[in-house]
Swiss-Prot record:
Name of the molecule in the record: Uncharacterized protein C10orf120 homolog
Compositional bias per record (Acidic residues), positions renumbered to this chain: 219-228
Biased composition annotated in UniProt, kind: Basic and acidic residues: 16-27, 229-247
Function: Dispensable for normal development and fertility.
Amino acid sequence: MIREWENGCPKIGKQRARDSRAQERMTTEGKLNKNGIPARVFNISDSFLNKESLSSQGDVCPASPLGIWTKFYKSDPRIALGKYSPLEKEILRLGGVHTVAARRFLTYKQEEERKMLKELQTLSADYKRVVDCRRQHTSPCATCGSLGKMWTAKVIVSPEEFRMPRRERLNVSKHIERMQLARALRSKQLLPYIERFRGSSLLPSGGLGPMARARAGEGQDDGNTDDGNDVHQKGRGEVESKTSKRQEIKMNVIFKSEEPQKCITSHPNDLKPFFPAKKAERSITGLTNRSLLHVSEFPGDLMLMNQDFLSRGIYPSYASQATRLEEENAWKEYMCKVAPHHY
């Protein structure tokens, strides 16, 4: 439509110019000099018409819709009066869309537009109101926050469950002794340990070495200490059971909402085996119409006959030989029957 209006306006101007020229011609032809030479006379109306035609050619047709539209929207830089917009002209000047300079120019313009939009959003009160409404009405999701709720629960546990098992106590006591020995070696305070080893050497060790005796002494001491700990813990447990048989514990329990199971997307090529499967060769097995009929009497075409030969394990050359032998035998029998009639 715009191109039609652009093309239409100059036509109107040209038509007016033609009319003015025709009128000028008529005036020159109508008035002649005394010598019979035509004299050219200029009318004021002609000059006005020429001015109008020039103005109509120079400007975009003011009476047309395009002229009215451009008159009101000339201040907008995004609207181009010609064939290309300013941005398109700049891209063409840089060598087209596929050049590096044009791409850089487009990214710069995009970044400039993004910054301008951000500034307008910060200044806009309506945008802030919309953002606040979205924050209020958004539902809790996995990224925003936890899906579970906090509940306080009372759990009643008997004191027997808090007792340390014997094996764990032995490991702890051995570890404590090893740490004490290491500290003593570091600070060179080995007197209490040497006395303990001497006391253990007086005990019957049955011809063991010094290291084995030391280990036996340690094990015996550990056993004694463990027994003492057991007795002490039992006594303390009895006292606790007398005072408070059960103990209440308050703890925070989080009940998570059931999340939907994530669907595992599988590609159809994942189900295929790594090595290509061998295609089973086609073979005819069992009794069929082909196996019931004789090879020579088989009514099918050559391809089916060949397939029948392969299924039976017969090669075509052998089959042709068999048919020839049968034909020869049949011909001999016929000749033997015909021979007695001649005599």
